[in-house]
Amino acid sequence: MTYISVFCFIVSLFLAKFLHKKWLLGVACALCFVYILFLVFDTILLIYLGKHFGFYVVVFIKTSIIGAPISTFARELIILSCVVIGIVLFCVILYQKISPNLSKNFKLAFLFILFLIIAFLTNPLYINAKEFYEIYNPPVAKFKKITYPYLKVPHSKAPKIRKNIVYIYLESYNRDYLNSQVFPNLTPYLSNLDNKIDFTNITQVVDTEFTLKGLFGSHCGINYTYVFGKDKTDKNFSENIKCGSEILKEQGYYLYFMKGADLEFQDTRNFLKHRKYDEMKGKTELLQDGEKSLNAWGVNDDDMLEVAWNDFVRLSKEKDNFLQTLLTISTHAPDGFLSKTCENLPFVSQDGMLRAVQCTDYLVGKFIDKIRLSEFSKNTIIILQNDHPLPYSNSGSVETNPKNSKNIFMILDDSINGTITIDKKGTSFDSFTTVLGYLGILDEMNFGRNLLKVDSMPFENNDEIYQKASRILTEISYDEIENKISH
């Protein structure tokens, strides 16, 4: 459709001289500006995010651009500004070239209008605009009928293994980084961890491609459609479903979360409250503990992990059981950030993002070593997972395609002998459910499945069933699901 749109637009340019009045030509040039701007903007989105303009992009801008440090996107803003100036100049030149040669021909003027309208109607921006209406007005009953057979009400039982959990989410970390054939010597620590179960065929579910949605999808085994200024800030948002953290809390676990960025960004604080976390730390809280080194997004990973270590020791001594959830920041798109501790590492690449990847490998690897060498190791399992693959990068040397890269998901436990590799198909919805399954608590949670015992959902990771469920998330009723099963 894009090719048809561009063809019709080019034809309309040749027909513009038949508008015969300068004010009509002025209106036409203004419409040309709008069309070209839409087309260029959509093309940029396609290059960087792999998606046309639509609801996903609006949500991404709303949650991941607004409130983000401007310096991080300085290059993109400069390019966009230059593009806008270039389009304006093109339209001015177009007007100046055509206006002296206007001629009167109503038939050809009509064709100009026709081709320009077709160009707009076949523009990807217009085509995807209808998605907004469908999202805000879902056929709830129809979507329930489609999704309920696959949604599983979580029924927990006392854990067979009652250990503390350190759950580490690696920001924008592709599994391909661990592949020595693709990136030799890039991740010597994380690639060589032992006493683990390594799940090698995990894909990211559609519409969980940025941090908050990645965390939600992992915790809850389901995703949600972002509703602006509405449900997500409600204290009761998503309380109609149960997620992994709440289930652990019911089992007596103390819930702790920390990341280097501000907890207000992407409404992380509200998410944690909804998920019943007891203790939360972000940039503001970390800076209150003393001076820290900062990057554009927040506290650097070396300082954050130092605080995390001290808190791990404190929690191990004070709490019977706890979940310590950590989110790194060094590999945040588009270029990553280098912690001061990593400045003298023997980097295998001078690329900014790959240096950040290697730094994260070093810092997280050392953090894991400290836990495993401590007196608390036997009573602790460590989970490694990326929140989502790298969405985009300014780097020309990062050859990993986020669409094709698998997710990282590992369970580390001293009780595991060697390395157990599981190549069973799974999704990011299955990770937290599998951790609960490893502990013996449950095997099914919403769309999540315990990959140690049962198969994942029989759908591709971008199947519409996930999107339909996300659009009616706040309407899902466990009572309705169980009543359907009983009947």
PLM features: what roles do these ranges have?
Residues A16, A28-A30, A68, A74, ...:
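A sequence-composition feature that detects small, non-aromatic residues
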Residues I118-P139, D289-N300, M304, A308:
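Basic, amphipathic N-terminal segments that precede the first structured/catalytic domain
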